[in-house]
From Swiss-Prot:
InterPro entries: BP-dependent_transpt_permease (IPR050366), MetI-like (IPR000515), MetI-like_sf (IPR035906), OppC_N (IPR025966). Keywords: Cell inner membrane, Cell membrane, Membrane, Transmembrane, Transmembrane helix, Transport. Gene3D superfamilies: MetI-like. Its main location: membrane. This is Putative peptide transport system permease protein BAB2_1051. Residues 97-281 form the ABC transmembrane type-1 domain. One of its GO terms (cellular component) is plasma membrane. It is found in: Cell inner membrane. Belongs to the binding-protein-dependent transport system permease family. The lineage of its organism: Bacteria, Pseudomonadati, Pseudomonadota, Alphaproteobacteria, Hyphomicrobiales. Pfam families: BPD_transp_1, OppC_N.
């Protein structure tokens, strides 16, 4: 007799496992996600351990130690003020990662609120989306430069500028998902059962928008790190005395031939961080995005 194929696509050991556990397992089997996670953990650990694995003084100057090349005493060399670049790059990681994560989380939260409001309350849709379209008409970095220049060089200004630039992207992603979800049978059933708008949104709409929003958040995280470095390079980003990868690169551009290490090491840190987060985002997109699953 012909053996009937099982209608289920999961293996027996997976029965009883929570969706979170199953998703985590699929992510850990994804090569890009694993590589990105390892790289990001290295950067994060270096930033967290900076007070213990450096001299702890990113702004300490020494005229005698100016332009020292990389060596045992100064792993990344010193800059034009004699400051230890190993220390400054690791402390710069704290600033860049914190700003990038803050911008990503704020953009996701505010974008989700705007996107769901536009999709659920259709009378606000045109107004909210026209505002988002107006913001998206400008390249994100140009919008951030304009806002940051207007507000002045402060950490809060950088966060406000970058968040304003990336909110529209999150809002449009959430709105697109919410428009589909509001027409589903289980949402109609919740309406007929007398559920309030807030309950439907928090129980049925928002949870099902989290997957695409999480993917977008990771890419915004990477973009924000690059944008913060750009703003600091231009002198309108993270202000002194805070160490920032972009400002370190800017300080080394006049010495790029004789003291190449000043620009090299923060540039490598920016590249590794952005690459790691993008690899994590690729893994999340492949595992969580149902459209890509169907295409595959």
């Amino acid at each position: 007799m012909t053996e009937l194929a099982s209608p289920t696509s999961f293996s027996m050991p997976d029965i009883g496992k929570s969706p979170v556990v199953l998703t985590a397992r699929r992510l850990m089997r994804h090569r890009s996600f694993r590589i990105g996670l390892v790289l990001l953990l290295i950067v994060v650990l270096a930033a967290v351990l900076a007070p213990w694995i450096t001299n702890g003084k990113p702004n300490a100057t020494s005229v005698r130690m100016r332009f020292q090349p990389p060596g045992l005493e100064h792993l990344f060399g010193t800059d034009n003020f004699g400051r230890d670049l190993w220390t400054r790059v690791l402390y710069g990681a704290q600033v860049s990662l914190w700003i990038g994560l803050t911008v990503a989380v704020l953009s996701a939260i505010l974008g989700a609120i705007i996107g769901i409001a536009a999709a659920w309350y259709r009378r606000f849709d045109t107004l909210l989306m026209r505002v988002m379209d107006a913001l998206m008409a400008f390249p994100a970095i140009l919008l951030a430069i304009g806002i940051s220049a207007a507000l002045g060089p402060h950490l809060s200004s950088v966060i406000i500028a970058l968040t304003s630039a990336y909110i529209p992207r999150c809002a449009r992603i959430v709105r697109a998902s919410a428009l589909v979800l509001r027409e589903t049978d289980y949402v109609d059933a919740a309406r007929l059962a007398g559920a309030s708008d807030l309950r439907i949104i928090t129980r049925h709409i928002l949870p099902n928008c989290l997957a695409p929003l999480l993917v977008t958040l990771t890419f915004v995280f990477a973009y924000a790190i690059l944008a913060e470095a750009t703003l600091s390079f231009l002198g309108i980003g993270t202000p002194p005395p805070h160490a920032s990868w972009g400002s370190i690169v800017a300080q080394g551009r006049d010495y790029s031939v004789d003291a190449w290490w000043i620009m090299l090491f923060p540039g490598i840190a920016i590249t590794i961080s952005a690459l790691a987060i993008n690899l994590i985002g690729d893994g999340l997109r492949d595992v969580l995005d149902p459209r890509l699953k169907m295409e595959g």
